[in-house]
């Protein structure tokens, strides 16, 4: 079993959306050896459910997110793969834990997009655009993890 964590600022918009989408794609592909989490680098939303905009877009696409609440990325977290939404989160993660054991990426490294950062829909209100960015990256991320961790699909 490998652990993957998506990380954004408050863990109410981008990273919980990515967690829910990734779980759905893993279910669709019948991959059971990847456990998905999400975390935030800021503590002001701890214990809160996903943002209303994230909930609406996930509901629109019939992707479950039951029981998800905001959690903080901590130095003691031990994930195999850490996927940040933007460079600021990469910097925050490295500051929180300068001795990371897991592999650290930005999500859009797994997309064909020119952008390198997933914009925060908390400020842009573009939840649909973020959904498209996350969805376009998840299968490539899954392919990478399956190969890197020598997992079986199906």
UniProtKB/Swiss-Prot annotation:
InterPro entries associated with the record: LMW_PTPase, Ptyr_pPase, Ptyr_pPase_sf, Tyr_phospatase_low_mol_wt
Keywords, comma-separated and alphabetical: Hydrolase, Phosphoprotein, Protein phosphatase, Secreted
SUPFAM superfamilies: Phosphotyrosine protein phosphatases I (SSF52788)
GO MF annotations in UniProt: protein tyrosine phosphatase activity
Post-translational modification comment from the UniProt entry: Phosphorylations at Tyr-122 and Tyr-123 are essential for phosphatase activity.
Catalytic residues of the enzyme: 8 (nucleophile), 14, 120 (proton donor)
Reactions listed under catalytic activity: O-phospho-L-tyrosyl-[protein] + H2O = L-tyrosyl-[protein] + phosphate
Principal location class: secreted
Subcellular location as annotated: Secreted
PANTHER family (UniProt xref): LOW MOLECULAR WEIGHT PHOSPHOTYROSINE PROTEIN PHOSPHATASE, LOW MOLECULAR WEIGHT PROTEIN TYROSINE PHOSPHATASE
Role played: Secreted tyrosine phosphatase that plays a critical role during infection as a bacterial effector protein that counteracts host defenses. Required for intramacrophage survival.
UniProt-recorded name of the protein: Low molecular weight protein-tyrosine-phosphatase PtpA
């Amino acid at each position: 079993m490998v652990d993957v964590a998506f990380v954004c600022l408050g863990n109410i918009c981008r990273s919980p959306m990515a967690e829910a989408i990734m779980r759905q794609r893993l279910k669709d592909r019948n991959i059971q050896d990847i456990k998905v989490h999400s975390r935030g680098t800021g503590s002001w939303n701890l214990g809160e459910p996903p943002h209303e905009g994230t909930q609406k877009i996930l509901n629109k696409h019939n992707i479950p997110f039951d029981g998800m609440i905001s959690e903080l990325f901590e130095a003691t977290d031990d994930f195999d793969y850490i996927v940040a939404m933007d460079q600021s989160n990469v910097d925050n993660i490295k500051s929180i834990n300068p001795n990371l054991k897991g592999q650290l990426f930005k999500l859009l490294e797994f997309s064909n997009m020119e952008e390198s950062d997933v914009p925060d829909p908390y400020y842009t209100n573009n939840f649909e655009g973020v959904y498209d960015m996350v969805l376009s990256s998840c299968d490539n991320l899954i392919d990478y993890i399956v190969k890197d961790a020598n997992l079986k699909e199906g």
